């Protein structure tokens, strides 16, 4: 268990790294029961739940935050990530989608699902590439899914992220 003086976040980080994910989540829930107003705890718990594919609970935690908190990092990024979890819901797995897109490059629906799966797998750059490809092939597809996907990813990554800077520039030159 915890060494004295170890912060809660450190304990959770260690449990998580060692694969004791449910214990980490339980510890966070316990802490949140002690301090139900803590935005930091809610955000951390939501992040962990998202990684465990428990999007519904993550969503309600994030929506329980004050609006000002919801609209800035890290909560805004997690909410953006939830959009990708929703897109990936019921989609084929990553490998199947990669094959689908390879066999039919014009399949924007498969590309969008692939991008969502890539985001959830932590491959943000590959996802950005898929959204750029959708935008180039069919800018109006799925109510501008290409552009909206890029913007949601920028939101998730934050303005300072080198990927955001690079792809925002590419988006701008594609649109203008």
Tell me the role of every PLM-derived stretch:
Residues 6-34, 44, 96-121:
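Alpha-helical segment of the N-proximal tetratricopeptide repeat
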Residues 13, 62-104:
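Alpha-helical adaptor scaffolds
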Residues 35-36, 69-70, 105-106, 139-141:
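Short coil turns that delineate tetratricopeptide repeat
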């Amino acid at each position: 268990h915890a060494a004295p003086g170890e912060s809660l976040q450190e304990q959770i980080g260690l449990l998580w790294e060692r694969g004791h994910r449910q214990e980490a989540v339980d510890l966070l829930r316990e802490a949140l029961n002690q301090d139900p107003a803590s935005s930091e705890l809610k955000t951390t718990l939501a992040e962990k739940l998202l990684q465990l594919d428990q999007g519904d609970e993550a969503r309600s935690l994030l929506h329980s935050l004050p609006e000002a908190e919801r609209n800035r990092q890290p909560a805004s990024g997690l909410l953006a990530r939830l959009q990708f979890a929703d897109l990936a819901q019921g989609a084929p797995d990553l490998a199947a989608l990669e094959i689908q897109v390879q066999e039919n490059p014009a399949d924007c629906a498969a590309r969008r699902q692939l991008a969502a799966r890539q985001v959830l797998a932590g491959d943000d750059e590959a996802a950005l590439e898929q959204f750029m490809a959708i935008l180039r092939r069919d800018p109006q597809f799925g109510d501008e899914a290409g552009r909206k996907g890029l913007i949601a990813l920028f939101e998730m990554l934050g303005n300072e992220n080198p990927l955001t800077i690079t792809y925002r520039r590419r988006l701008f030159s594609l649109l203008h």
